[in-house]
Curated annotation (Swiss-Prot):
InterPro entries: TDU_repeat, VGLL4. GO terms for biological process: negative regulation of cardiac muscle cell proliferation; negative regulation of cell growth; negative regulation of DNA-templated transcription; negative regulation of hippo signaling; negative regulation of Wnt signaling pathway; positive regulation of protein catabolic process. Keywords: Nucleus, Phosphoprotein, Transcription, Transcription regulation. This is Transcription cofactor vestigial-like protein 4. It comes from Mus musculus (Mouse). Its main location: nucleus. GO terms for cellular component: nucleus. Residues 44-68, 251-287 are annotated as: Disordered. It is found in: Nucleus. Residues 275-287 have a biased composition (Low complexity).
Length: 287
């Protein structure tokens, strides 16, 4: 019983000493700022109001009498009292009507500014501010990767804007964009051309876009140098490919086609050899 009384007296003595030190610290700050000493009374009352509940059990008997739940509750109460001491100047400013923002508060994000009053208002429980933080909207800030890209790259990623891609990114060998390989041309030029490239292929979707955009100024794509032209007749094609052989085949075919016609005019049936000759030349024509 004597030890209990001594522990209680020791606790009360330490409590008074802490309160006196806190009051002296606040009075010293008030004197440095030139404020009256009466403003420290609400702070002292606020500090004393947070000390609620019976005094803790003596350290010599704590390990025998306290349960794990009581220990957690005691630690939580100590944490809440420390947080209330930290945020008590902010509460004092709002009570006195001083709502001016601190320069450090201006640099905070909206979520951090919302977290500070939430922690001070919910002094009964430290984690009461977590739901309010979850309900706050996200900060609408620009992504850091967007700052490294140029304005042309950001504009090309917009689907509503039709722009000209760079020369290395184009997959068509003919582009009619004003921004060509040699730079920008005048806006009033009649047509847009660029030299053909044998390595790239032409995209029909891109060509259709330029055909509709340029109208009469649009020029058809020029064929590649190694491409085969399909202009001219079939006879010219085989004459260039086969030479004299094609002329012989064509002469034999003409003679074979004329002999059945002459025989039918005389009323005589056509000889089977003529049909054989005409059929024998047909595979060579196909080849």
């Amino acid at each position: 019983m004597l030890f209990m009384k001594m522990d209680l007296l020791n606790y009360q003595y330490l409590d008074k000493m802490n309160n006196n030190i806190g009051v002296l610290c606040y009075e010293g700050e008030a004197s440095l700022r030139g404020e009256p000493r009466m403003q420290t009374l609400p702070v002292a009352s606020a500090l004393s109001s947070h000390r609620t509940g019976p005094p803790p059990i003596s350290p010599s008997k704590r390990k025998f009498s306290m349960e794990p739940g009581d220990k957690d509750l005691d630690c939580e109460n100590d944490h809440v009292s420390k947080m209330s001491r930290i945020f008590s100047p902010h509460l004092n400013k709002t009570v006195n009507g001083d709502c001016r923002r601190d320069p450090r508060e201006r640099s905070r994000s909206p979520i951090e500014r919302a977290a500070a009053p939430a922690v001070s208002l919910h002094g009964g429980h430290l984690y009461a501010s977590l739901p309010s933080l979850m309900e706050q909207p996200l900060a609408l800030t620009k992504n850091s990767s967007d700052t490294g890209r140029s304005a042309v790259e950001r504009q090309q990623n917009r689907p509503s804007v039709i722009t000209c891609a760079s020369a290395g990114a184009r997959n068509c060998n003919l582009s009619h964009c004003p921004i060509a390989h040699s730079g920008c041309s005048a806006p009033g030029s009649a047509s847009y051309r660029r030299p053909p490239s044998a390595t790239a292929t032409c995209d029909p979707v891109v060509e259709e876009h330029f055909r509709r955009s340029l109208g009469k100024n649009y020029k058809e794509p020029e064929p590649a140098p190694n491409s085969v032209s399909i202009t001219g007749s079939v006879d010219d094609h085989f004459a260039k490919a086969l030479g004299d052989t094609w002329l012989q085949i064509k002469a034999a075919k003409d003679s074979a086609s004329s002999s059945p016609e002459s025989a039918s005019r005389r009323g005589q049936p056509a000889s089977p050899t003529a049909h054989m000759v005409s059929h024998s030349h047909s595979p060579s024509v196909v080849s």
